[in-house]
């Protein structure tokens, strides 16, 4: 499903006080600073095997929201996984945790937002959950809803709105 990008500030103006605007302050780390698409989710803690498996599938222009528990101890995404996501048609990644290879990520045509960076690799046991509601910064990211992301922040709109 292709979603036309709209600036988050315009969405806030149009939707009004009930807007689902994420309060968490993510760093813009990917080469694409504006992205939008249907949400898929992964919840994993310091383990990126499930995340890599999901990004190995066709993304269809989607946005993968990753709840890493806010951990900055290990990176959940690096250049190899980000390139896998880009090659499989994902529009962007929103990571409640750390990423690595930030210089390489800036040169890739994919959106990547994360709390920060850490060069340490994560474990690879496959622990985690997929396609579950994830609440970050006062907003629930529900699979199938639409995420819009730019330099101003992240807004979530219910599918069909």
From Swiss-Prot:
It catalyses: 4-hydroxy-4-methyl-2-oxoglutarate = 2 pyruvate; oxaloacetate + H(+) = pyruvate + CO2. This is Putative 4-hydroxy-4-methyl-2-oxoglutarate aldolase. GO terms for biological process: regulation of RNA metabolic process. Divalent metal cation. Its EC number is 4.1.3.17, 4.1.1.112. Its cofactor is a divalent metal cation. Homotrimer. Catalyzes the aldol cleavage of 4-hydroxy-4-methyl-2-oxoglutarate (HMG) into 2 molecules of pyruvate. Also contains a secondary oxaloacetate (OAA) decarboxylase activity due to the common pyruvate enolate transition state formed following C-C bond cleavage in the retro-aldol and decarboxylation reactions. A divalent metal cation binds at residue 101. It comes from Mycobacterium avium (strain 104). Substrate binds at residues 78-81, 100. NCBIfam families: NOT-MenG, PRK09372.1. Belongs to the class II aldolase/RraA-like family. Pfam families: RraA-like. Transmembrane segments: none annotated. Keywords: Lyase, Metal-binding. It is an enzyme of class 4 (lyase). GO terms for molecular function: 4-hydroxy-4-methyl-2-oxoglutarate aldolase activity; metal ion binding; oxaloacetate decarboxylase activity; ribonuclease inhibitor activity.
